[in-house]
Amino acid sequence: VESTNAASRLSPTQERTLDLLRRPTEPVIFDSDQIAAFTSNFSEALDHFVARLDALGESLFISKGMLTSVLGCETHFQQKEEFRWNVTTAIGTVAHRAIELLTGWRGAPYPATLVDESIARLSEKPNSLGDFLTSMTDGDRADLTNAATDRVVKFTESFPPLQQSFIPVAESSIRWPESGTIVLGGKSDLTLGRAEHGESRKVIIDLKTGGAWPNHMDELRFYALLETLRTGIPPRLIAGFYLDAGRAVP
């Protein structure tokens, strides 16, 4: 992200965020031989576990949520209850979809407009979330709209306007390898920039509410791993952005 003339019209919180995201004067370039060696070593280690799963006739998809759960408490991970959607669990998905719409929306839409559109689009999906959204009561809809709008408002208060020159992408999916017995996959909340000519320019941001926890950085490292395996170029910066505090933790 480069400096813009609009910086003089930003709030202190937005200026602080822009300072963090701004690309440094010196380009960030990782040693290509080291990256190639890392990828080779990682692939070799993964092949060991692939062989074990193939012998059992099983496959495995590794996600951020799975890693967080199993590293937090293996017993709880093995005995986890069936997931059910409710207002509390749907807030994050609805807010993230609204922010995704914001990155490509022309003009300056009201946060509530984005949330309404988010709910409408998610309701059309033939899945369990769509079923919940189409069947929820008026009271639940009001609670969900208010909570998701609060997150979108905090996002717009904390981030500078996402100009197209920033190359903003919300909910960007990454998987590696494309198929196989073991596949790693994730979806980052927000990415800015892109790698160019071997230079690391991409910034990966995970949006959070509440306080910071140690596993949050583990989740960001997982995204950085996926980006490195997919492109051969690590991201320039990974950061958790805490909406309630209006601050990023790189």
PLM segments and residue spans:
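Hydrophobic/aromatic-lined pockets within catalytic cores
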Residues: 83, 99-107, 209-212, 228, ...
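Mg2+/Mn2+-dependent nuclease catalytic core
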Residues: 172-250
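C-terminal, charged and often intrinsically disordered regions of DNA end-processing helicases
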Residues: 1-91
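Short, hydrophobic/amphipathic alpha-helical patches that form generic packing surfaces
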Residues: 76-80, 93-104, 225
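A non-catalytic, helix-rich entry segment at domain boundaries
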Residues: 98-171
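Hydrophobic (often cysteine-bearing) scaffold residues that line and stabilize catalytic clefts
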Residues: 87, 91, 95, 107, ...
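Short acidic, glycine/Ser/Thr-rich loop/turn "cap" segments at secondary-structure junctions
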Residues: 78-82, 128-140, 175, 204-208
